[in-house]
């Protein structure tokens, strides 16, 4: 019996440590919604928004793409006003963990960023990516205008026609209404916390798989 209990708690600890969700000692209750870039330096760049699982992973993936200047982790797609991470974790806010991508359109276009989105996650799993499950981890390609919407719709049609994933794509196509920047400790989480169990076991391997799959879109190594 003691051995069974030991295995149970060991498994429980592993699941908790392998989850994107953490309980920080200090939580910001009301993150500020992001409408305009926070930095004058970013105002010359365009923005794109994607949700494809834990934003720690997704932020690092887009940071590696040539032409991307900055990536912000946050929340979008729901109805709860000024959500915080604790609320997001319940899966009842309607929001998904989302990244805001600032990019230079002279170096990379929206369709390429969309290709990065589909090449870096499984768009056929509903409300789940890897070990993370819940509506907050669902797949969403956001659009800012009709042109971006058309690009997303056409791209999904191409993927479906080519049967690239072998199963129906469940990615939502949504108009970006508001993006809420996540708490500060989430920003650059993978870069700043390379020894975190989730980062080592899930996030970094996911980033490396993407890099191996799409070397042509990566920034030059310094």
Task: State each model region's role.
Residues 1-9:
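Bacterial N-terminal signal peptides that target proteins for export
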